[in-house]
Regions:
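N-terminal, intrinsically disordered, polar/charged segments of Gram-positive cell-envelope systems
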Residues: 26-62, 67, 92
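Short N-terminal helix-initiation segments at or just after the protein's N-terminus
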Residues: 6-14, 39-50, 64-67, 81-86, ...
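Conserved S/T- and glycine-rich ATP-binding loop of Class I adenylate-forming
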Residues: 68, 76, 203
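Structural alpha/beta surface segment adjacent to cysteine/selenocysteine redox centers
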Residues: 72-74, 80-161, 195-198
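Conserved short-loop catalytic and cofactor-binding motifs
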Residues: 56, 105-108, 144, 173-176, ...
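C-terminal cap of thioredoxin/glutaredoxin-like
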Residues: 1-39, 71, 87, 159-228
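Surface-exposed loop/turn and secondary-structure junction residues enriched for glycine/proline
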Residues: 51-54, 60-62, 77, 85, ...
């Protein structure tokens, strides 16, 4: 075999092995989601006619003049960036001062493990609103790659056991594995679609979806509402 043919053969072998590796890794990742339903498989009656603030995790005074809803996916890198870069400042300037009450709604659209991560958040929220916000910040800090299946049952159970204290872990485990709050996640998803949410993070200010490209634009719109 001459040198040129050897190089071509070697390159073909490497490409073939890489393709096999990618395929096997893909199969392993998706095997972790066995038994996790997609939205069409989550059954139950859902009526979307308004933002149901009373069903959402919240921060701030119920007497705040402005209500802001954040739609997010726990697998979304931009959502992680928003939380890491702006959340603490937003909380200091608007929530702690009583100007804004912030709500969270799931728009879990990236993959089925997005839905599972969202349902884990719902399970924690139904035990403690405050502990939900611990989960919110810490899960983003431990976020995996968007293109990979990482928010698996095993990961989420271990994560919550090690990182979120002050909840009934056995109740959480039961709710996660039995998909207790999957319908709540689907309701959030349907609400997002009803109001035209098409990405994350996106925000709603006093029932109005706003299209923004920067933190400064978000706070400017909030300031306008405060002074109205």
């Amino acid at each position: 075999m001459n040198k040129k043919k050897y190089i071509i053969t070697l390159a073909g072998t490497v490409i073939g092995l890489f393709a096999i590796f990618v395929f096997v890794n893909y199969k392993i990742q998706y095997s972790e989601l066995e038994g996790i339903p997609n939205y069409t498989e989550i059954k139950g009656n859902i009526v979307i006619d308004r933002f149901k603030y009373e069903k959402q995790p919240s921060l701030g005074s119920s007497e705040a003049k402005v209500k802001v809803v954040e739609f997010a996916d726990f697998k979304c890198p931009a959502c992680k960036n928003w939380t890491a870069t702006y959340f603490d400042q937003f909380k200091k300037d608007y929530i702690d001062t009583g100007k804004v009450q912030l709500y969270f709604m799931n728009y879990a659209f990236i993959d089925r493990d997005s839905i599972l991560a969202a349902s884990a958040g719902e399970a924690i929220y139904h035990q403690s609103n405050d502990k939900f916000w611990d989960y919110y910040k810490k899960l983003y800090q431990n976020q995996g790659k968007e293109s990979e299946i990482w928010a698996t049952p095993k990961f989420l159970l271990n994560f919550v056991k090690n990182e979120i204290d002050g909840i009934d872990y056995e109740q959480f485990r039961k709710d996660l594995t039995e998909h207790t709050y999957m319908l709540d996640v689907k309701e959030d998803y349907k609400t997002a679609g009803y109001y035209g949410i098409n990405g994350t993070p996106q925000f709603v200010i006093d029932d109005q979806v706003v299209r923004i490209s920067s933190y400064e634009e978000l706070t400017r719109l909030i300031d306008q509402k405060i002074t109205e």
